[in-house]
Regions:
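Domain-level signature for soluble enzymes in the chorismate/prephenate branch of the shikimate pathway
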Residues: 2-182
Length: 182
C-alpha cells in the first residue's frame, strides 16, 4: 500500500509499525475485531514460568525468538538492553526454554502462552486491525470517496455484529403489548 501497488488494504497496526510505515500510509479507520474477540492483540515478552527473568533488563545478553524482529529491536533499544533476537518461523511459544531464554509473541487471550507454561513479563505493543490507504490515493477525490464508502461498509458490518434485528408481524393495536414483552 505504501508503495502505491494497492490503493488500500487491511492489516494490523503491528505490521505497519514492524515495516516502518507509521506515517507513510493513511489510516482510514480502526476495525475492532480479531480472531477470538473484539479486543486488541498484544505483542508480549514471555518467559518460562520458572525463569529468573523478571524485567526487560534481565534480558541483557540473552536470546529471544520472535516473528516481529523490528518491534523487539526497537523495544530493546528503548530499554538500553542488548540481546540476540532471532526470527521465528512459527510455533514460537515452544522454543523457550530449550532454544531461547525468552519469546515475543502475539497474544489475544494468553491461553497459548499459559498452555506452554509461559508467563508475560511485559507488553511491547498493542495492535488492532486498521483500514489503510496509500497517501496519494487518499488525496484523489474519486478514490477517497470510494474508500470512505468502504469504511462505512466495514465499520457498519462490525457494528452490526453487536446488535440484534428483530422483526415481528403483529396487529398495530397490540404494539404497546408487544413492546412491553420485548
Amino acid at each position: 500500500v505504501e508503495l502505491g501497488l494497492l490503493d488500500a488494504g487491511i492489516c494490523g497496526y503491528d505490521w505497519v509499525y514492524e515495516n516502518g510505515n507509521v506515517g507513510k500510509v493513511q489510516e482510514i479507520c480502526e476495525l475492532n475485531y480479531s480472531k477470538a474477540t473484539t479486543n486488541p492483540v498484544r505483542w508480549v515478552l514471555a518467559v518460562p514460568n520458572d525463569s529468573k527473568i523478571k524485567t526487560v533488563k534481565d534480558l541483557q545478553g540473552k536470546r529471544i525468538s520472535t516473528e516481529a524482529i523490528g518491534i523487539v529491536k526497537n523495544y530493546l533499544k528503548k530499554n538500553h538492553v542488548k540481546a540476540d533476537v532471532e526470527f521465528s518461523w512459527g510455533a514460537t511459544e515452544v522454543k523457550a526454554p530449550e532454544l531461547v531464554d525468552a519469546i515475543v509473541d502475539l497474544t489475544e487471550t494468553g491461553s497459548s502462552l499459559r498452555a506452554n507454561n509461559l508467563r508475560i513479563v511485559d507488553t511491547m505493543l498493542t495492535s488492532t486491525t486498521r483500514f489503510i490507504a496509500n497517501k496519494k490515493s487518499w488525496k484523489n477525490a474519486a478514490k477517497r470517496a470510494k474508500l470512505e464508502q468502504l469504511k462505512m461498509l466495514l465499520t457498519g458490518a462490525l457494528e452490526a455484529q453487536r446488535r440484534v434485528l428483530l422483526k415481528c408481524n403483529a396487529p398495530a393495536k397490540t404494539l404497546d403489548q408487544v413492546v412491553k414483552v420485548m
